[in-house]
Amino acid sequence: MHYVLKICTKDAKGLIYRIADVIFKYHINIIKNDEFVGEEMFFFRALLEGEFEPKAFMGTLEAMLGERAFIELHEKRKKDIVIFATKESHCLGDLLIRHYSNELEANIKAVISNHNELKDLVDKFNIPYHLISAENTSREEQEGRVLECLENYQFDYLVLAKYMRILSPNFVRHFEGRIINIHHSFLPAFIGANPYKQAFERGVKIIGATAHFVNNNLDEGPIITQDVININHEFSWKQMQEAGRNIEKNVLSHALDLVFEDRIFIHKNKTIIF
């Protein structure tokens, strides 16, 4: 069996030795490990291999490190996700294809959308599609129906693949640290509809994308990964849009790989990634 062990605790001398000693006593093999110290905090991630009782192992670590330490042990497996989308197909389509090709370290349990444009696409992959419209209803009522729908699924993460709805603090609170979003990096310079057209009119020279965890502040959650590409005056706004969509797909895909491999620590409003 393979497991991922993650530890975050106040830095102290001898932590690596003490953790390794517990691992050794349980006859566990360390396949790979990483550590980092910053802001007087110690971060440790290890890929483990062995047959052992996880509950007893965790109890020993907790007794040694103290109750204030953050300790997680996950069996290495594919994660389960639900995808939220609206009308744009590029990010959703990329994830569906990767899932179909067994290149995504996750099982897509369902797709939820506030519009019906993407239903035919999702149906081709035999994945449940739920239309939960936001028309003529309050945000609270629409999110309540979304929560009811989610009760039918066991999942690890929610992925916002260009879901053009602002989630309420109450909704986010249900899934703290478990919602991943992708957006173009023009914010806050180009807010609202047609950001690529706005960027074209402004004459920007780079375009990019950011993947981040969602918190109560719009597009200000802990950043997972970012990327940019250079453009010039020869790009029409349609070409900028196409290039932007490609980079959004790539950034979201890379971010999800990091999340699904349990490589990320969220500390304050930042991420530590191994």
Locations of the language-model features?
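A conserved regulatory-domain signal marking ACT and ACT-like small-molecule sensing domains
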Residues: 1-79
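Short, low-order "capping/linker" segments at domain edges
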Residues: 78-94, 98
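Short hydrophobic segments within beta-strands
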Residues: 8, 82-84, 112
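Donor/substrate-binding cores of folate-linked one-carbon enzymes
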Residues: 115, 138-144, 153-274
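Conserved beta-strand segments of alpha/beta enzyme cores
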Residues: 29, 107, 128-130, 178
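A short alpha->loop->secondary-structure connector
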Residues: 99-107
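Adenosine-nucleotide cofactor-binding segment
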Residues: 123, 127-153
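Short internal beta-strands
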Residues: 106-117
